[in-house]
Amino acid sequence: MGVAIDKCETRPANIEAILSGLDRYNPETTTVFQDYVVQQCEDRTFDCYANLALLKLYQFNPHLLQPETVTNILVKALTVFPSPAFSLCLALLPAYTQPFPSSEAEATAAQMSDFVESVQKLARLSSLLESAQYAQFWSTLNSDDLYADLVADVAGFEELVRIRIAVEVGKAFREVNAEVLEQWLDVRNSEALEKFVTEVCSWEVDKSGSATVVKVPTNKENEARSEVKSERVGVDMFGRVIRRGFEQAA
């Protein structure tokens, strides 16, 4: 069972106090939340509830919006996929930033804004991760210098995403071709892959066959289980059905 979205073990006491009271709607707390986003980027934590509170303040006070803070929040949300965090954050942004503008005016505004371009590029990355197109995610991330600029403030971004991908792979597979896994994790060579899967994931590398295979230990997600359901239907149940049929006919 996942952790509730309003919970965060690393949340400072002053942030907890703001979120628990009416000050969460006070525009003066915007700078406090912004500093907290910077802290999250530096110490590799993520507080979705606090970040949503900041985006809600931006929604009510558009003049306070800081594009860099918003993009940092979105980048941090990428590091906790698969989760609704990115979609929730995206939904609180101005309509003209959305990947699919609903009007010509919004489309025109989107074309003229670097901020909108950044948001939509990050939305593209989120879509690739959520749809498990991991190789395409890395190639897209490496295809444009703007992506490098967007993730620069988030310490360990690639490592955090790589670990999340490994977690998802471990849920779905018992063994994976090493060359395929290299592409999914964006590691440069077989030595780097072997180090990652053995030291970080505690998986095994099998080189005995014609192709190197990475073996994932059995867990409750990837274990093949046959599900057998048995239902007992008594004669009295049939009797009620037949009797009801005659009653309706009458």
Swiss-Prot record:
Belongs to the eIF-3 subunit K family. It is found in: Cytoplasm. Keywords: Cytoplasm, Initiation factor, Protein biosynthesis. Pfam families: CSN8_PSD8_EIF3K. Gene3D superfamilies: ARM repeat, domain 1, Winged helix-like DNA-binding domain superfamily/Winged helix DNA-binding domain. PROSITE patterns: PCI. Component of the eukaryotic translation initiation factor 3 (eIF-3) complex. This is Eukaryotic translation initiation factor 3 subunit K. Its main location: cytoplasm. Component of the eukaryotic translation initiation factor 3 (eIF-3) complex, which is involved in protein synthesis of a specialized repertoire of mRNAs and, together with other initiation factors, stimulates binding of mRNA and methionyl-tRNAi to the 40S ribosome. The eIF-3 complex specifically targets and initiates translation of a subset of mRNAs involved in cell proliferation. It comes from Emericella nidulans (strain FGSC A4 / ATCC 38163 / CBS 112.46 / NRRL 194 / M139) (Aspergillus nidulans). PANTHER family: EUKARYOTIC TRANSLATION INITIATION FACTOR 3 SUBUNIT 11, EUKARYOTIC TRANSLATION INITIATION FACTOR 3 SUBUNIT K. One of its GO terms (cellular component) is eukaryotic 48S preinitiation complex. One of its GO terms (molecular function) is RNA binding. InterPro entries: ARM-type_fold (IPR016024), CSN8_PSD8_EIF3K (IPR033464), eIF3k (IPR009374), PCI_dom (IPR000717), Transl_init_fac_sub12_N_euk (IPR016020), WH-like_DNA-bd_sf (IPR036388), WH_DNA-bd_sf (IPR036390). Residues 46-229 form the PCI domain. GO terms for biological process: formation of cytoplasmic translation initiation complex; regulation of translational initiation. The lineage of its organism: Eukaryota, Fungi, Dikarya, Ascomycota, Pezizomycotina.
